[in-house]
């Protein structure tokens, strides 16, 4: 049974830790293991209890615990979770809760569906000034669609006889 608990320990140790060798588990993943395996029930064992036990079993300046320290932590949490049982029975009860469990990814942000994107990028539904930026096929006009181009011909704006000067002098 300890081997199944060890496999669960390794699965949680590498969860979300790309640099982890699965030999040691961080406090974050230890808390996740306790929560996902229903060791932390919110009444007898709370997240505070889990953090305190983790700090108690780890070395002074370490940030992780190995499997042996993990077993000590589970023994302490087991006594809190299964009151009235001796430490070995409590440990076996905790290991039974851990059997076959994997890190859960519920509540993780999913990618959005395409429906909203299609609606927002349909240029045929654009109105006002945004409509001017695209031609009938939906292709962007580029700079002509974004800003009014100035007439640099030298004539005053609104002058009707633009381009007729050379024709009059000949």
Curated annotation (Swiss-Prot):
Only expressed in male reproductive organs, including testis. Expressed in elongating spermatids at stages IV-VIII of the seminiferous epithelial cycle in testis and in mature sperm in the epididymis. GO terms for cellular component: cytosol; sperm flagellum. GO terms for biological process: cell differentiation; microtubule polymerization; regulation of flagellated sperm motility; spermatogenesis. Gene3D superfamilies: EF-hand. GO terms for molecular function: tubulin binding. Keywords: Cell projection, Cilium, Cytoplasm, Differentiation, Flagellum, Spermatogenesis. It is found in: Cytoplasm, Cytosol; Cell projection, Cilium, Flagellum. Residues 129-149 have a biased composition (Basic and acidic residues). Disruption phenotype: Male subfertility with a significantly decreased sperm count and motility. Sperm shows increased irregular mitochondria lacking lamellar cristae, abnormal expression of electron transfer chain molecules, lower ATP levels, decreased mitochondrial membrane potential and increased apoptotic index. SUPFAM superfamilies: EF-hand. Residues 105-117 have a biased composition (Low complexity). Residues 105-170 are annotated as: Disordered. Disulfide bonds: none annotated. Belongs to the TPPP family. Probable regulator of microtubule dynamics required for sperm motility. In contrast to other members of the family, has no microtubule bundling activity. This is Tubulin polymerization-promoting protein family member 2.
